[in-house]
């Protein structure tokens, strides 16, 4: 189950903050996941480690290419397309489905005021809730 959820990552994960005025104009963002919660039917939700969730803790959001990529930290390189991006006065809202054959979807919201990241990954039998921070990259 965790393997089917894995590698979506946001994460998000989405730790410094940048001013809101320039945040949406940047080309990419570095995001670190700080907390992960796994939720399943009957047993509910519990906090798990990034490793147990089989997630990468640091991701890059490339706004120009509309991709969510693993940070180049020596691990396996992955990139998932971002299906939709919406920018409001207060947030950047992202959505994607990763590998289509895995019956999963993910979404994320990044605060333009604080850089806080909240994200979720849903599959047929479970979901992950992710919390973290993002910062604009030069």
Short names for language-model regions:
Residues 1-7:
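Positively charged n-region of N-terminal signal peptides that target proteins for export
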Residues 20-26:
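Boundary at the C-terminal end of the N-terminal hydrophobic targeting segment
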Residues 28-66:
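Short, solvent-exposed loop/hinge segments that bridge or flank secondary-structure elements
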Residues 35-38, 70-78, 123-128:
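Short, solvent-exposed aromatic-acidic interface loops
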Residues 129-137:
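Short, low-complexity, Pro/Ser/Thr/Gly-rich segments in the mature regions of secreted, periplasmic
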């Amino acid at each position: 189950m965790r393997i089917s959820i894995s590698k979506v990552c946001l994460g998000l994960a989405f730790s410094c903050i940048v001013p809101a005025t320039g945040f949406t104009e940047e080309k990419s963002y570095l995001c670190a996941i700080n907390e992960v919660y796994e939720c399943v039917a009957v047993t509910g939700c519990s906090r798990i480690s990034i490793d147990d969730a089989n997630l990468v803790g640091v991701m890059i959001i490339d706004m120009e290419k509309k991709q969510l990529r693993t940070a180049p930290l020596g691990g396996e390189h992955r990139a998932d397309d971002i299906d939709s991006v919406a920018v409001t006065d207060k947030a950047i809202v992202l959505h994607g489905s990763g590998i289509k054959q895995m019956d999963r979807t993910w979404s994320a919201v990044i605060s333009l005021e604080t850089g806080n990241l909240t994200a979720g990954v849903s599959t047929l039998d479970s979901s992950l809730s992710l919390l973290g921070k993002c910062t604009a990259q030069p």
